[in-house]
Structure formats: structure tokens, C-alpha cells
Amino acid sequence: MAKIVRIKGEIVGKDEPMVFTKEYNVLKENDALETMYSEIGSKHAVKRANIKVVEISEISVEEIQSPILKKTLEMN
């Protein structure tokens, strides 16, 4: 069964650290991590070593902050 995972972290190694929060609907936490590394790495041109994960947590549908993820789940 799918679960909703929230990842909080920061990108280091740039002029100033950038903080981010990402939410994914995945089967395993590892899938969410891989997707996050891929998205952040390609969008900001940083290596995985420069992406620091601060927190990974499973959240309920009511806690979702991402409007895109909310809309996607409502459609299903």
C-alpha cells in the first residue's frame, strides 16, 4: 500500500544553504529519496553529496501541503 512521505532537507555547497520540503506518494521511503535526489540534483545542478536530508516522515492525507499531490490523490 502506498504511503505519503515528507522529506525535509537542505542543499549545501552553494553560496548560501537552501532549505526544502518535498512530499511524495510512494511504496517505500527509498523510492521517495531517489526521486528527491533526482529532482533536486537536476533542477539545482548539485551532487547527491551536497543534499543533506534532515528529516523523513510518513504523513497522513490531511497533513499534505503540496497542492499538486493533494489534487492527484483526490483524482484517484
Curated annotation (Swiss-Prot):
GO cellular component entries: ribonucleoprotein complex; ribosome
Ribosomal protein is among the record's keywords: yes
A molecular-function term among this protein's GO annotations: structural constituent of ribosome
What residue ranges carry the coiled-coil annotation?
A: none
Q: Which biological process annotations from GO are given for this protein?
A: translation
Keywords carried by this UniProt record = Ribonucleoprotein, Ribosomal protein, RNA-binding, rRNA-binding
Its signal peptide is: none
Q: Which Gene3D superfamilies match?
A: 3.10.20.10
Family as reported in the entry's similarity comment: Belongs to the eukaryotic ribosomal protein eL20 family.
| Self-association state and partner proteins as the record states | Part of the 50S ribosomal subunit. Binds 23S rRNA.
Name of the protein this chain belongs to: Large ribosomal subunit protein eL20
Task: Identify the species of origin.
Answer: Methanococcus maripaludis (strain DSM 14266 / JCM 13030 / NBRC 101832 / S2 / LL)
